[in-house]
């Protein structure tokens, strides 16, 4: 029975979907004005893991992850580049899709773009005004009146006065309260705009998600997820909008993944430690990056460093080595089939504890190596597949395409051939020199009756 940590209640809760057997999940996606970074990679991989587990558990899942394709940053970047906004956003949507596919992230059922749902946003704003929870300002903006929603602060666990004291709020004469937030922005020269009852303008960021998830799921659904940085104000404001418009509970379970740090410092462009997914994939295999993310609990901070990625590569190589040594038999996924399957399920049902689930994979690999059991190797591959891992040909992974600074497969084969010739000529010193050179360059040789095989360390 699945239990998950609910940010709203600040405790683990037994998961009970609104409709038995069916789950609706919405995750806040990317604002597409630049290439995706490591923080985006974690959101993608974490909620892909959640989606895979819900489906493996037998749920009929509908997964929606939105795309923000209108935003101040997008408008600014398009102006800097001198290109149309839709050209800029499509380029980065395509790049995002490439990054996600490389990381083994399955596409959500729906990926709505904010610009496709502006009429829905206008309708929700009208509902909020009609209930006295929003107001049109003289300048053409529309604001949410936070004092008119009694539940404001429930997700962050702070009262409105506490939030106001702790936030740096710009004084805006158009607002009734400094904590009021914008629902509709009046048009500015040169910016995209849509007609509305309040004049030409565009939606605020927060209303976009409320309108899109209502379009797919109605006013009440099961799981809403995103990065921890979205808990306040974005998700707090979503609750205010959706519950303020419909006077019913919005979301049953809120999930937030932890931050990524780089060498124990916050990732930021100003510190020069900001990495895009593409930059990381130039150095490391994409499955290694996915494995690195899943080795940590999704709510824990994740520290990125070259040492940690190298450790992840070495660990994943051990699992693939077990599959290379013992060909995997086909096994049907039955959670009561053996103790490994039961413990894997128990780990994942405990708030998606991939740390313990991966530990089960290592136990399986060790036992499969020891017993030479094709069935256990089959379970290793099958359970790994639930996490989106271990589905490649083991030799292909272990010999992998060379990454930045690595020796190529062709060069390895040439050196192995030279070593073979040296051994045939009983030139043991040259044979040892070649082996030592390969070891120094991260290549492990394994001599057997069928010849010499190799893998990356």
From Swiss-Prot:
Subcellular location: Cytoplasm
Motif ('KMSKS' region): 266-270
Coarse class of the protein's main subcellular location: cytoplasm
Binding site for ATP: 269
Annotated Zn(2+) binding sites: 28, 209, 234, 238
Cofactor(s) in the UniProt record: Zn(2+)
SMART domains: DALR_2
Catalysed reaction equations from the record: tRNA(Cys) + L-cysteine + ATP = L-cysteinyl-tRNA(Cys) + AMP + diphosphate
Motif mapping: 'HIGH' region: 30-40
InterPro entries xref list: Cys-tRNA-ligase (IPR015803), Cys-tRNA-synt_Ia_DALR (IPR015273), Cys-tRNA/MSH_ligase (IPR024909), CysS_C (IPR056411), Rossmann-like_a/b/a_fold (IPR014729), tRNA-synt_1_cat_dom (IPR032678), tRNAsynth_Ia_anticodon-bd (IPR009080)
Manner of cofactor binding, per the entry note: Binds 1 zinc ion per subunit.
Record's keyword terms, sorted: Aminoacyl-tRNA synthetase, ATP-binding, Cytoplasm, Ligase, Metal-binding, Nucleotide-binding, Protein biosynthesis, Zinc
Listed EC numbers: 6.1.1.16
GO MF annotation terms: ATP binding; cysteine-tRNA ligase activity; zinc ion binding
First-level EC class: ligase
UniProt-listed GO biological process terms: cysteinyl-tRNA aminoacylation
Any GO CC annotation of this UniProt entry: cytosol
Family annotation (Pfam families): CysS_C, DALR_2, tRNA-synt_1e
Classification via HAMAP family: Cys_tRNA_synth
Family designation: Belongs to the class-I aminoacyl-tRNA synthetase family.
Known partners and oligomeric status: Monomer.
Name the UniProt record assigns to this protein: Cysteine--tRNA ligase
Species in which this protein is naturally found: Laribacter hongkongensis (strain HLHK9)
Organism taxonomic ancestry: Bacteria, Pseudomonadati, Pseudomonadota, Betaproteobacteria, Neisseriales
Gene: cysS
